[in-house]
Amino acid sequence: MAKETREIIYLFSSTGNGHFYTTTKNKRSHPEKIKLKKFDPIIKKHITYTEKK
């Protein structure tokens, strides 16, 4: 059976309020950490979410 290349990651809010999103990414083709602008429902604004383990 083939080894999975996609891994589940957590994107945590940069405000530190504890909100996070889960997604998957291909670790082989994108080894760097992801930074995305997404909506934070706690503060009701779009902010930067960063990947953490």
Swiss-Prot record:
Species whose genome carries this gene: Blochmanniella floridana
Record gene name: rpmG
GO terms (BP aspect): translation
Keyword Secreted: no
Keyword entries, A-Z: Ribonucleoprotein, Ribosomal protein
GO cellular component: cytosolic large ribosomal subunit
Annotated family: Belongs to the bacterial ribosomal protein bL33 family.
Superkingdom per UniProt: Bacteria
Protein name, UniProt field: Large ribosomal subunit protein bL33
Membrane-crossing segments per the record: none
